[in-house]
């Protein structure tokens, strides 16, 4: 008995991404308890659906987990047509199909993060986000924009960047924002990995995290980056991706055991954890 996790070649780096690794750690513990093996497969982007069809035809897997869903996600309808049990880690906003999913409330998380910065007195707030086509990134942008709108703050499009969530991209995008004629006094970012890149950019410009530029990050509670300090370095919206892996596995195993059950969605709320990276803006 086997559960499949297919990763496209364009997302090959995800195989060593600590977010993916922690998700797999949570899921695989559940698989092992239920007697299932885990299959990782790296496939060309254009052959991803073909790979699903071949796995289903050969009965090579009992179910699959879909990673990194886009706003417009074709894999969901394709898998429903194959009658192959699956669960999506995340959601796809433009998909009308019914499907199993586990997701964090991304819009609410980034609304709360932006609202906190506004309450501290910030009016120039940047957003360093994930790839725009990804559903989580779209929802986080929506939460950020909604907080600004509800506080009558104009959205500065130059303050919004999208890229893959790596440390170098966090650094590069932070430099772009810091080089603006009126740089933001605060930044919200989608990953603690990117936050570390932002911090490197601040250090390079001899700016102090929190004092000169406030930063709030989304924190997937990664085992590799866990902060044991009484006051964390970063103020963060925190939701355990390992727990998301466990819940995704539970939901998939239920569906395998009872293929006729109605699809289910699980929405997780992120905690807002106060750290030392957020303070009122300094007078300019």
Residue locations for each model-derived region?
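Flexible loop/turn connectors
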Residues: 175, 180-284
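Alpha-helical structural signal in soluble globular domains
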Residues: 26-30, 78, 139-151, 197-205
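Periplasmic-binding protein-like
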Residues: 61-67, 126-128, 160, 181-191, ...
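Hinge/beta->alpha junction and helix N-cap segments in small-molecule ligand-binding domains
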Residues: 9-21, 40-49, 102-112, 128-173, ...
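Conserved H-loop
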Residues: 123, 154-156, 208
